[in-house]
Amino acid sequence: MRMRLAYKLALLTLLVAGGAVVMLAWLASTNASRLLEQEALVRLKENVNQGSIAFERSFETVKGDLSLLKHTPALGGVIRAIQGGGYDDQLNETRTGWEHRLQEVFRTVMQQRSYYSQVRLIGLQEGGRELVRLDRVGGSIEVVPAERLQQKGQRPYLQQAAMLAEEAIYFSEVTLNRERGRIVVPWEPMLRLATPVFDPQSGAVFGVLVLNIHFDRFTRPLRQKVLEDSFYLLANGRGEYLIHPQSEKRFSFEIEEREESLLLDYPQMDLQAELEHWRERDELDHEHSSTRQLKGQGVGVTLRPFYFDPLHPERYLILGTVASSQVLEQQAAGFRQQLALLVLLVV
């Protein structure tokens, strides 16, 4: 009788212990799944933050190049020669001679940066006529001859840059390049930076120096830093795609009867409110990012604003990484299987 009671007590103890182990294993599995999800989102966020740092360096490089070009002696020589009726009395050089020197400076900079598609000096006289212009055509860099130089006086980048202070820089929207009003095919997404150039003698605005940046080439290093089973995206401040692996989603604002954006693709994130918050740019809010696991869509998404225009601090681009939940779910399932096996061995 006592032996039977002992067996029953032992069996009861075993069942209680086994149940406790199973419960603990279940709780551990659940918590582990949540931790894995959180860890994946942290990795997404870190990836976007690293991309933002790299992007900032690229912008600093471009701004440095623009400043270098602006202060090159050849540019001052061109200005003096034009103001002197074709001859620079100060250094005894013709306008043509100075223009050749400036062309070589432009060429050197373009050779160092594959994403520069065009470098120009534009004067304000004669309707904003181009004075010196180099284009990247295929694999070569070409000087545009005088008869092909154009008037750009009505272009917003020229008008707005001409009104800036000496060291200020105008940043355009990222748009598709057009020739004679038509979008160039294949597409050439362009970002234009422009800064005013002043007559050293009178102090008046003489013209504008303009860099045309091929945006796809400019962002190539950024897109190469993407995590496994994820992709980078880049959008303007309205959430419209500039960079996306699905080409049909890009630059929908340039194409009639097409609408593609972050707001439409990820409605669960309530991005309209987020965009307004980022536009206000609360300096006390150092987070400036939005990270969500969208289980209904099977993805994790991290977005953050990239502020690039000191003259207009409300302007930003949106950097983002989107990752599939499939790998995360596989990792969680494998962990649960290991726990289940451990429970069986213990019990």
Predicted regions and their residues:
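Extracellular/periplasmic juxtamembrane segments that couple receptor/chemosensory ectodomains to their
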Residues: 260-338
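A short, polar/charged loop-to-alpha-helix boundary motif
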Residues: 141-149, 216-224, 249-263
